[in-house]
């Protein structure tokens, strides 16, 4: 029975592939209904993983509608090292993430993975056609875009980084100068082997309340006026308030519910009252 089932699955996937090649528009209609089951197959049907990788589709920063991994690869820049993606949230939130701009500015396409299963399945895939699939909200993804100038800015920012880390304590794993922010003062990422903050939130909502707490890494933009002003401040209460707002607004920007929304508003109001 198992061999019959396997043969049937392979034949069905072959028909899907034929449809995707012969009638892409009709296949896109099909994918709106069956993209998720195909993605689930990546996790549960290893023998057909290569075929499934050709069949699944994603949204992208470069075009409307869906794209395949194969089409993404064809559009890659010659100096591009990885297939970049961002998962964990609805499409609108992901597209507005401050993490995306640095990659777009360098001409790197980012796949928008707005299905909650993406954050679970895609990390298990690892590579497509020998190219690494890299989440841009992981700490190591910045290595692909970091410049020597960024490294110099990081050295110069050490005093303000320490201020923020001392203020936030164990709410963050570390505070680092960002190479991927231009307009925003801060963003959050996670260590390579840690689940994203969005995944942690999703798993807890599903009832897995005994998960260990993985703290995020806070990245700050050394060129942003808020960070430059913070570097000049000695008022410990103000430093604490600004640091908390920098973290909480970074979480909110990624669609994450903050633990103390009332405290966030109070600290934001305190900052406004002292600066206006």
Which residue stretches match the model-derived regions?
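Conserved GHKL (Bergerat-fold) ATPase module
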Residues: 1-276
